[in-house]
Amino acid sequence: GLPICGETCFTGTCYTPGCTCSYPVCKKN
């Protein structure tokens, strides 16, 4: 629910644990 995980997810995948893709950026749950 929180911004921001420091990566984009244009590929649809977030590599940071605990983060999900909220296109086009990863966000913490």
Curated annotation (Swiss-Prot):
InterPro entries, A to Z: Cyclotide, Cyclotide_moebius_CS, Cyclotide_sf
SUPFAM superfamilies per the UniProt record, alphabetical: Cyclotides
Post-translational modification: Contains 3 disulfide bonds.
Cross-link (Cyclopeptide (Gly-Asn)): G1-N29
Disulfide bond entries: C5-C19, C9-C21, C14-C26
Any Pfam family the entry gives: Cyclotide
GO biological process, one term: defense response
Expression sites by tissue: Expressed in root nodules but not in seed.
Keywords: Disulfide bond, Plant defense
Function: Probably participates in a plant defense mechanism.
Protein family per UniProt: Belongs to the cyclotide family. Moebius subfamily.
Domain notes: The presence of a 'disulfide through disulfide knot' structurally defines this protein as a knottin.
The protein, known as: Cliotide T18
Source species of the chain: Clitoria ternatea (Butterfly pea)
